[in-house]
């Protein structure tokens, strides 16, 4: 009897392995298409601007305005998720944003472009912070580094697979088959799978471990005990959820750190194909394969760093060092544009660092925020970070139109990431879980 009352580490590991295999692969695929739908305009740009006679500034604003809708709807969407349940809300979000993303193939004016990107951002707003909250209700703090790395490796994998796939679509459909240009086919072929995944989410996800029919009673007990221990270690508050969200200085500081990380991430995601093209590569498929290299190495690096953080129970330097790598990589890329091999190496280092900063960041606020602040707080942090998605591409586009080069913008973004790493070191002093 005593053995069943106190499960050993092997038993716990077996339970969490089962939960991981049940949840993470499907959520990974959903996030892969989420990210692909968000950033595939970077490849569409290679043909879209000439077809529609858009300027670089129009593209930058259209790419970035997505995040205005994202920011405005982030907190209410995450609160709705807690009210209606993850299964229903995640399914609804995916069906809506997949439909809107597909409709980008009908764009013919800047107004169409801005409007669809704005509403797509609003539809996607609750997905990522909702999944972070959802996973935190299944996995305790000391297991989240690896889990977040597995989940968020969908970002580099979306680049790894999506870049060559997008390049192939642009080339294969360049003749205008079916009356559609290559960039229109890309939005169609990459948007429809998201709608299908949204329908599947309704049937495959469980709202929580208590309602998961696929778990045995003793497995639920393991999860419940670990969640209770996690809750006991969180800060306590007497304030309402909304009061704590907007009056908690830590939330605003974490939001600023996340903004700095995302400044580098979105600069890379939206401009990597164009930067590689400017290095002298003209074929879209070649650009796609070269764009995949940084994402491949970033995926491996992300998983290794996530594993290291959990094994060492160390968060501080596992967050700050990748952020510094992102800044250094951008500086290398911008200073060696005459040497494509070194420039691509710099972009690879920047991608590895910036993308790895994402999963290393999220275990920190989920461990330090009280239960009352978690849903709204995580959404606010995410919304602040996503403002970088609006500012980064717009600034790069504006600088490119004004100076004919992206160099000045990349210097600025490198400085922002470096400043964020300093703030991260300050905010995480004493955190060892």
Each language-model region and where it sits:
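Cytoplasmic membrane-interface "Motif A"-like loop-to-helix N-cap segments
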Residues: 82-94, 310-323
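Helix-breaking motifs and short loop linkers at transmembrane-helix boundaries and internal kinks
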Residues: 53, 85, 106-112, 123, ...
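Glycine-rich segments within core transmembrane alpha-helices of 12-TM secondary carriers
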Residues: 146-171, 193-194, 382-392
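Conserved MFS/SLC helix-loop-helix module at the cytosolic interface between two early adjacent transmembrane helices
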Residues: 72-111
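Extracytoplasmic gate region of multi-pass secondary transporters
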Residues: 41-42, 243-302, 358, 362, ...
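Cytoplasmic helix-loop-helix junction between adjacent transmembrane helices
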Residues: 116-153
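Helix-to-loop junctions at the C-terminal end of transmembrane segments
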Residues: 73-85, 301-314
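C-terminal transmembrane helical hairpin of 12-TM major facilitator-type secondary transporters
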Residues: 315-364
């Amino acid at each position: 009897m005593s053995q069943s009352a106190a499960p050993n580490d092997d038993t716990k590991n077996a339970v969490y392995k089962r939960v991981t295999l049940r949840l993470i692969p499907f959520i990974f695929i959903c996030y892969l298409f989420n990210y692909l739908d968000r950033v595939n305009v970077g490849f569409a740009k290679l043909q879209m601007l000439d077809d529609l006679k858009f300027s670089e500034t129009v593209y930058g604003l259209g790419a970035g305005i997505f995040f205005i809708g994202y920011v405005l709807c982030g907190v209410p969407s995450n609160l709705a998720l807690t009210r209606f349940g993850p299964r229903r809300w995640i399914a609804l979000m995916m069906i809506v944003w997949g439909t809107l993303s597909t409709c980008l193939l009908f764009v013919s004016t800047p107004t169409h472009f801005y409007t669809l990107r704005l509403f797509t951002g609003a539809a996607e707003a609750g997905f990522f912070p909702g999944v972070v909250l959802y996973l935190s209700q299944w996995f305790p703090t000391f297991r989240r580094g690896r889990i977040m790395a597995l989940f968020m490796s969908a970002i580099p994998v979306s680049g790894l697979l999506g870049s060559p796939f997008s390049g192939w679509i642009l080339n294969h459909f360049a003749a205008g088959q079916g009356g559609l240009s290559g960039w229109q086919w890309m939005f169609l072929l990459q948007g429809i799978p998201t709608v299908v995944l949204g329908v599947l989410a309704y049937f495959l996800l469980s709202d929580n471990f208590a309602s998961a029919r696929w778990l045995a009673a003793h497995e639920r007990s393991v999860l419940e005990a670990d969640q209770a221990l996690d809750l006991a270690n969180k800060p306590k508050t007497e304030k309402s959820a909304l009061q704590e969200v907007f009056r908690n200085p830590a939330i605003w500081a974490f939001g600023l750190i996340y903004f700095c990380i995302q400044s580098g991430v979105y600069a890379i995601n939206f401009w990597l194909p164009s930067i590689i093209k400017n290095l002298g590569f003209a074929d879209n498929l070649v650009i796609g394969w070269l764009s995949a290299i940084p994402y491949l190495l970033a995926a491996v690096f992300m998983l290794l760093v996530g594993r290291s953080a959990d094994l060492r129970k160390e968060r501080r330097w596992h967050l700050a060092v990748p952020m510094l790598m992102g800044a250094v990589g951008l500086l290398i890329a911008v200073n060696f544009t005459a040497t494509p091999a070194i420039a691509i190496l710099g972009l690879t280092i920047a991608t590895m660092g910036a993308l790895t900063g994402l999963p290393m960041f999220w275990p920190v606020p989920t461990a330090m925020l009280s239960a009352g602040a978690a849903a709204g707080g995580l959404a606010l942090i995410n919304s602040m970070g996503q403002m970088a998605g609006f500012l980064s591409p717009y600034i790069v586009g504006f600088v490119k139109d004004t100076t004919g080069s992206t160099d000045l913008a990349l210097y600025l973004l490198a400085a922002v990431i470096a400043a964020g790493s300093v703030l991260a070191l300050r905010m995480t002093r004493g955190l060892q879980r």
